[in-house]
């Protein structure tokens, strides 16, 4: 599962396009994150989406913050996801658990049921994060009632741009293929290196300790 997570995060890189408005840049980030989240949910792995989607959403918030002039740490981005996610997630965890159970019984069908919901949830979190940073810039409050309203409107609008089931499943297969290909390549490289090291093992007397290039403390 870790190779798949790394592949997902590697595929979600974003540079702010100065030719676009902040709103347009944010739209690209949110849609990309939501599509990747839906693809993860389409994977026939029980509860995989619960484990993989949070790191993706954290990276989404990092990107949105950067677009609005905020350089925040991953730890702070995670806190924002948890804070805003609490507003969005009433009942979501229970539904995700039930969908995880569905994947145990009917892996492919369970994944296809989950993908649209996770897409909408991630899209709503992205939109709520966007308003969160906009309010930070202007110094306006953004309490729970306002967060809930923004999230509800975003969930509704996400249905109009929802990708097809084949879009989710095709991307999921491609991510899985790349992750497996990369893992296989790394295993082969490690095996070749180990074989080379065993053939040319240095004599103990020739090994000298190197001083660190910078202080370790």
Predicted ranges, named:
Residues 87-98:
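A generic, lipid-embedded transmembrane alpha helix
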Residues 38-52, 96-118:
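Short hydrophobic membrane-inserting alpha-helices and related fusion/pore-forming segments
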């Amino acid at each position: 599962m870790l190779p798949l997570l790394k592949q997902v995060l590697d595929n979600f890189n974003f540079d702010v396009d100065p030719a676009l408005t902040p709103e347009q840049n944010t739209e690209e980030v949110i849609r990309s994150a939501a599509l990747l989240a839906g693809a993860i949910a389409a994977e026939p792995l029980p509860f995989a989406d619960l484990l993989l989607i949070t790191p993706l959403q954290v990276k989404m918030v990092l990107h949105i913050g950067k677009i609005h002039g905020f350089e925040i740490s991953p730890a702070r981005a995670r806190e924002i996801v948890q804070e805003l996610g609490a507003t969005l997630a009433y009942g979501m965890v229970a539904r995700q658990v039930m969908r995880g159970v569905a994947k145990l019984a009917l892996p492919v069908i369970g994944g296809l049921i989950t993908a649209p919901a996770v897409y909408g949830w991630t899209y709503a979190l992205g939109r709520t994060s966007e308003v969160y940073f906009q309010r930070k810039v202007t110094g306006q409050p953004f309490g729970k009632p306002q967060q809930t309203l923004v999230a509800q409107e975003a969930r509704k609008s996400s249905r109009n741009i929802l990708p097809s089931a084949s879009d989710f499943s095709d991307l999921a297969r491609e991510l899985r293929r790349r992750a497996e290909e990369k893992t296989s390549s790394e295993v082969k490289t490690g095996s070749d290196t180990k074989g080379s090291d065993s053939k040319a093992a240095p004599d103990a007397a020739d090994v000298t300790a190197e001083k660190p290039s910078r202080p370790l403390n």
